[in-house]
Amino acid sequence: MKGSTVHTKWQAYCRLMRIDKPIGSLLLLWPTLWALWLAGRGIPEAKILVVFVLGVFFMRAAGCVVNDYADRHIDSFVKRTASRPLPSGTISEKESKILFVVLILLSFGLVLTLNSMTIWLSLAALALAWIYPFMKRVTHLPQVVLGAAFGWSIPMGFAAVSESLPLVCWLLLLANICWTVAYDTQYAMVDRDDDLRIGVKSTAILFGQHDKLIIGLLQLATLLLMVAIGWLMNLGGAFYWSILLAGALFTHQQKMIAQREREPCFRAFLNNNYVGLVLFLGILISYW
């Protein structure tokens, strides 16, 4: 195989795993770090931290691969996704399946270094990662499944650090689901016209003209759940300041999506990286 061909293929694999678009990994990373710090009431064990950070990137890559495989026959009809490696033919279906298996094996190899409770919970993570891409064909609520998939590192983190699943763990998972549905609805607003044309379901379509209101309510629910978590965990003032900053970011996002235009909606989605970061810094400083 010629060097240029190898380079082209490697670039295609990177695009399939979204290495060139780290936003998804970051949105998966922040809740993971929230959970690890809350479960350990401070900096977690180094080995556990490394396992989860690597696991985030491997599982996010695996999720992107299976998502593109599931959407391979419809992505060519959507402007934003038509040039992806599978619909464009740069990578074959067989190659994508092999890559998915490799990424899952790498992820599971990491989990095997943790306790048995975490290993069992990881099976649910695999199931959620596999079924999510197919949900948009059967329900208008695929974003809820995505929220569970993106948040499943939370119970896994608590299990790995404390071998327990306290109330705070489930409140944090619920907060993450609310947040995920909010930001992924913003993301779905970008593709709403294309999705309506090809019959793909999403919360952006389900919510219709009430989309901005429901996103706002989900963002409010996220903040209120975070307040409850801060109270239960006796977190310091820095955490509550971080909640206020997250609220300001949510308000800014509402302004961006006000006209429901594609580019501002996508920027609002990207802005959620700062929400996750700010909340993590609030937790981090509280345990300093």
From Swiss-Prot:
InterPro entries: HB_polyprenyltransferase-like, Prenyltransferase, UbiA_prenyltransferase, UbiA_prenylTrfase_CS, UbiA_sf. This is 4-hydroxybenzoate octaprenyltransferase. Keywords: Cell inner membrane, Cell membrane, Magnesium, Membrane, Transferase, Transmembrane, Transmembrane helix, Ubiquinone biosynthesis. It comes from Yersinia pseudotuberculosis serotype IB (strain PB1/+). Catalyzes the prenylation of para-hydroxybenzoate (PHB) with an all-trans polyprenyl group. Mediates the second step in the final reaction sequence of ubiquinone-8 (UQ-8) biosynthesis, which is the condensation of the polyisoprenoid side chain with PHB, generating the first membrane-bound Q intermediate 3-octaprenyl-4-hydroxybenzoate. It is a multi-pass membrane protein. It is an enzyme of class 2 (transferase). GO terms for biological process: ubiquinone biosynthetic process. It catalyses: all-trans-octaprenyl diphosphate + 4-hydroxybenzoate = 4-hydroxy-3-(all-trans-octaprenyl)benzoate + diphosphate. The gene is ubiA. GO terms for cellular component: plasma membrane. Pathway: Cofactor biosynthesis; ubiquinone biosynthesis. It comes from the Bacteria.
